[in-house]
């Protein structure tokens, strides 16, 4: 299995962690990446959604993340993906707590029934054996009740190779504090590598999570959207001041890469949410964000980004 203890990993985040962003984070020091959520039913009905599943060799090791409510469908969709794309892992998402997903009794909803989670993993592991692709899982502490040890044991018994634990319940979403000590307790019953996740906001938090939980890897989520340099900071053990010009260069490079798997107009529309994120914490950025994201077309958007680079001193 392709995993090294001590890895720092970019978490999957819907609408953000597509191929371009993943590549840039790998260049900045992320050790591993995951795709956004891909519906098993969608794959079986309509084929693989390439905007979500597209990746380059630079992004490896990569986990293609699948969700659903039916073990057989998840296993079948995983085989379709394995045959066509040959990822390093198929990841089964049991952690997403978005209401729409929960209403479909998928992902985080399944935390209510650990034996069913085990069945999903077991069927998928068996289905993927001919392709030599292992199965990982992304979980939370539980649905409403914290029963993470039981969940870990069920998944191990079913043949999972790697587990990422977000240290909140599905009901909590992102509210309250992530209970890092529960990752440590889950690690005690684990025979597979455990990746810790939740409330990792700086490179020092990455260091602290390794120390406090004894986890094998740390997953960085929302903090990487505003500071993708967090991976480089951890590797170099220092804070890195990133100016407006460098932030806007990041956006322009991401935008250029996005056109490999979507139209330029679509890329320009989608990059706006990342612009808002990457300007977080930049002094006097409120009016700059508004100015850039209200560009009416691609040409105007790029022009405004270039203007922002030239005006860096005004925002320093």
Swiss-Prot record:
UniProt: FMN binding residues:
12-14, 65, 138, 197-199, 221-222
- Which cofactors does it use? FMN
Source taxon at top rank: Bacteria
Q: Which residues cross the membrane?
A: none
> SUPFAM superfamilies of this UniProt entry?
FMN-linked oxidoreductases
| Active site: residue positions | 96 (proton donor)
Which keywords does this chain's UniProt record carry? Flavoprotein, FMN, NADP, Oxidoreductase, RNA-binding, tRNA processing, tRNA-binding
E.C. code: 1.3.1.-
The molecular function terms in GO held by this entry are: flavin adenine dinucleotide binding; tRNA binding; tRNA dihydrouridine synthase activity
Similarity-based family: Belongs to the Dus family.
Q: What does this protein do?
A: Catalyzes the synthesis of 5,6-dihydrouridine (D), a modified base found in the D-loop of most tRNAs, via the reduction of the C5-C6 double bond in target uridines.
What's the protein name? Answer: Probable tRNA-dihydrouridine synthase
Which species does this protein come from?
Aquifex aeolicus (strain VF5)
Lineage, top ranks: Bacteria, Pseudomonadati, Aquificota, Aquificia, Aquificales
């Amino acid at each position: 299995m392709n995993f090294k203890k001590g890895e720092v990993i970019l978490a999957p985040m819907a609408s953000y962690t597509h191929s371009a962003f993943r590549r840039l984070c790998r260049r900045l020091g992320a050790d591993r990446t995951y795709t956004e959520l891909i519906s098993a039913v969608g794959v079986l009905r309509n084929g693989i959604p390439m905007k979500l599943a597209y990746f380059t060799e630079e992004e490896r090791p990569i986990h293609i993340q699948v969700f659903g409510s039916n073990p057989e469908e998840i296993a079948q969709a995983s085989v379709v993906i394995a045959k066509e794309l040959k990822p390093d892992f198929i990841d089964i998402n049991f952690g997403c707590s978005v209401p729409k997903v929960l209403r479909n009794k998928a992902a985080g909803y399944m935390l209510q029934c650990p034996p069913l989670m085990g069945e999903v993993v077991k069927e998928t592991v068996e289905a993927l054996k001919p392709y030599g692709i292992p199965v990982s899982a992304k979980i939370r502490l539980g649905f409403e009740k914290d029963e993470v040890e039981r969940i870990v044991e069920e998944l191990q018994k079913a043949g999972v190779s790697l587990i990422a634990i977000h240290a909140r319940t599905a009901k909590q979403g992102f509210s309250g504090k992530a209970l890092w000590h529960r990752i440590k307790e889950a690690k005690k019953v684990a025979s597979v590598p455990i990746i810790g996740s939740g409330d990792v906001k700086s490179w020092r938090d990455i260091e602290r999570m390794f120390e406090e939980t004894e986890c094998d890897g740390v997953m960085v989520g929302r903090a990487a959207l505003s500071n993708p340099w967090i991976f480089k900071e951890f590797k170099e053990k220092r804070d890195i001041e990133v100016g407006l010009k460098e932030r806007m260069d990041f956006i322009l490079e991401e935008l250029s890469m996005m056109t490999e798997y979507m139209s330029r107009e679509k890329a320009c529309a989608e990059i706006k949410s990342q612009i808002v994120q990457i300007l977080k914490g930049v002094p006097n950025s409120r009016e700059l964000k508004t100015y850039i994201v209200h560009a009416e077309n691609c040409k105007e958007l790029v022009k405004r980004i270039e203007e922002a680079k030239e005006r860096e001193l005004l925002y320093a």
